[in-house]
Amino acid sequence: MSRYRGPRLKKIRRLGALPGLTRKTPKSGSNLKKKFNSGKKEQYRIRLQEKQKLRFHYGLTERQLLRYVHIAGKAKRSTGQVLLQLLEMRLDNILFRLGMASTIPGARQLVNHRHILVNGRIVNIPSFRCKPRDIITTKDNQRSKGLVQNYIASSDPGKLPKHLAIDTLEYKGLVNKILDRKWVGLKINELLVVEYYSRQT
C-alpha cells in the first residue's frame, strides 16, 4: 500500500487530529462521534482506527509500519512503546518535532532534497534513525536555511519535547536522549496497534 497523498481534511475527520500530517484539526461533531455496532466488529474498528492514526500521522506505507512492528516485537521491552520510539526517532519526525518543518511530509521533502545534515553529513533518507547526541543542521547556504527559518521562528518553544533541543540562531537541533512515552506527539493507544497486527497473523 502506497503512502497517502489524498485530502488531509478527510483523514482527520475520520481519525482525529494528526499533527504530523496537517496543522488542521477536526471540527466537533465530525465522523468521530458516529455510532457503530457493538461486539467484535466494533473492537476491530477501534484497533484499525488506531493503526490508521499511527500510519497517517507518521506518513508511512502499510509495509513500512508492519516492518516497524516486527522490529519492536523483537525487543525485550514493551512492543508498543518501542514502536513509538522507533517512529519518533525517524529523521523526518525529529525535524517536525524540532519545528524545522510544519508537517512530517514537509520535513520529508527537506531530507529528500538534501537540505539536512546529521553530524555534519548529508542524509537524504527520511527514515534515518536518529540517536542520542546526534546534531541535526541545515546545509550552510541561504536556500536551505531559508526553508526552515520561518517555521523555526513561528514554532512554540513550550511544545518542544524534552528529548530534543534547538538553537534557533544556528538552525541546529540536538537529540538529547530517547524520548519518554509522555512526549509522543500523537494521542494514540499503541497497545491496540500491536493487538491489531497480532490478530492478522
Swiss-Prot record:
Q: Which UniProt keywords apply?
A: Chloroplast, Plastid, Ribonucleoprotein, Ribosomal protein, RNA-binding, rRNA-binding
Give the UniProt record's GO annotations in the biological process aspect. Answer: ribosomal small subunit biogenesis; translation
Q: Where does it primarily localize?
A: plastid
State the superkingdom.
Answer: Eukaryota
Q: Does the keyword RNA-binding apply?
A: yes
Q: Which gene encodes it?
A: rps4
Supply the name of the protein.
Small ribosomal subunit protein uS4c
Q: Which segments constitute the S4 RNA-binding domain?
A: 89-157
PROSITE patterns in UniProt: RIBOSOMAL_S4, S4
Q: Which SMART domains match?
A: Ribosomal_S4, S4
Example GO CC term: the record gives: small ribosomal subunit
User: Which Gene Ontology terms cover its molecular function?
Assistant: rRNA binding; structural constituent of ribosome
